[in-house]
């Protein structure tokens, strides 16, 4: 490097570095804090092929939450990119096989506090980096309508298991479509919430400006109900959130009159869709119009570059979070 150091300088630097290394040694001896785990649980088991015919499950367990709450009587699956204390978590990848979190993600704690019952971890794509359903190291997750086809990804298991009725609801994750795509392909309701509405604390990051957790269910009401439970500030644990904000009762808003509501359809969004998908969206828009809403096409030219922009952000973010960091 072209540096010239005298023996005296080297001695000073060596003494300085030695002190720094002692600090690292001390840190390695410290016992890290452990978060309390509120509800009794056992580790569960890896399901046999007969227990997971679509390969939708990564791990089966049975964790009962509070005796009463908004989710009382509801069964829920958690995408395997989200931590559940004491339950193995692989995130679809051989890299994490054998890892067992010691904490519950915030959304998991909220579900249990609301009386939900967790039945297991749902399979997802390898590090959540695929929109289809064939990259999980345990094998592909099959589409419940046609087992020769993909269930979509990366929240593949969540969508497939919700459709079959093995669970009432599921938590999915979405960066560039990972809730919406499998929900569409399996025929359920999936929502990517407003950025920062649902805390991401305790889930594997890909890119902090793209990461979302959201609800998946067989109908809009249950999707809204789960969103009510998991939304809200997380005590500054998620830096993307405001310190305080109001969470509406979304289930009550389902009864809101549509008269006077303004809804925009992005015209560029239809350019890459198959015709039958376009038809379904337009039929839905017509139903909203009949209910009194004003539905209009709106042009956002930059939307055409959305895939390119999202891919670049996602790849660089994934490199920083997954390869340079520890994904948490």
Regions found by a protein language model. Name each.
Residues 143-155, 196-203, 319-328:
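Short, basic, helix/turn surface patches
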Residues 105-109, 220-224, 316:
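A structural signal for well-ordered alpha-helical segments within the folded catalytic domains
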